[in-house]
């Protein structure tokens, strides 16, 4: 069989010759990784954002599948994790007969910009005491932002991390996540 990994972002990790995707290892299958358009090497110049759509992503996967189907004529499995899992679902939606099996891992399905399912879930996980300790820690780290931000910036610089948003905003997201 052939496993087509419907990556939701970049796929440079797949260039590591020792990397094996879980299903391909379990099934001793061929692997094809498809990087999501507008990420890493799959970014066109100039960037025309009107072509960054779920349907176009499914079209990409369909084109790759058609290009390789004569080389790999056996069963085909689509899989992806997180946004890649969403991509697996969308690929199946637009091209239901392209693959024999779709295995999306942790594919989030949002009901809207403000989904509303997260808050009730977060109010139930763990214990009230543990949730309070986490909240207290987050508040303390936010209160000490002026003192901690230089360390955070230094860490980001040392790791070569670059952001499209101001580093102060990234700090806040890191604390809250």
Map each language-model feature to its residues:
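The serine-hydrolase catalytic nucleophile loop
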Residues: 13-21
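Alpha/beta-hydrolase fold nucleophile elbow
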Residues: 72-82
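Short beta-strand element of the alpha/beta-hydrolase
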Residues: 1-9
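Alpha/beta-hydrolase active-site loop
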Residues: 50-71
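Conserved alpha/beta-hydrolase
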Residues: 24-44
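Gly/Ala-rich beta-loop-alpha elbow adjacent to hydrolase catalytic centers
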Residues: 80-84, 88, 92
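Alpha/beta-hydrolase active-site loop signature
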Residues: 10, 36-40, 109
């Amino acid at each position: 069989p052939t496993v087509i990994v419907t990556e939701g972002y970049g796929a440079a990790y797949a260039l590591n010759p020792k990397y094996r995707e879980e299903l391909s290892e379990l099934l001793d299958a061929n692997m094809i990784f498809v990087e999501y358009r507008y990420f890493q090497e799959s970014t066109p110049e100039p960037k025309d954002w009107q072509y960054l759509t779920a349907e176009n992503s499914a079209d990409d996967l369909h084109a790759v599948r058609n290009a390789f189907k004569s080389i790999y004529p056996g069963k085909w499995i689509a899989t992806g994790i997180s946004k890649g899992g969403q991509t697996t679902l969308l690929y199946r939606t637009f091209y239901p007969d392209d693959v024999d099996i779709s295995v999306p891992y942790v594919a989030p399905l949002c009901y809207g910009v403000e989904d509303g399912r997260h808050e009730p879930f977060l109010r139930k996980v763990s214990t009230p005491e543990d949730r309070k300790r986490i909240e207290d820690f987050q508040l303390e780290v936010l209160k000490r932002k002026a003192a901690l931000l230089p360390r955070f910036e230094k860490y980001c610089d040392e790791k070569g991390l670059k952001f499209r948003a101001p580093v102060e905003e990234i700090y806040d997201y890191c604390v809250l996540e």
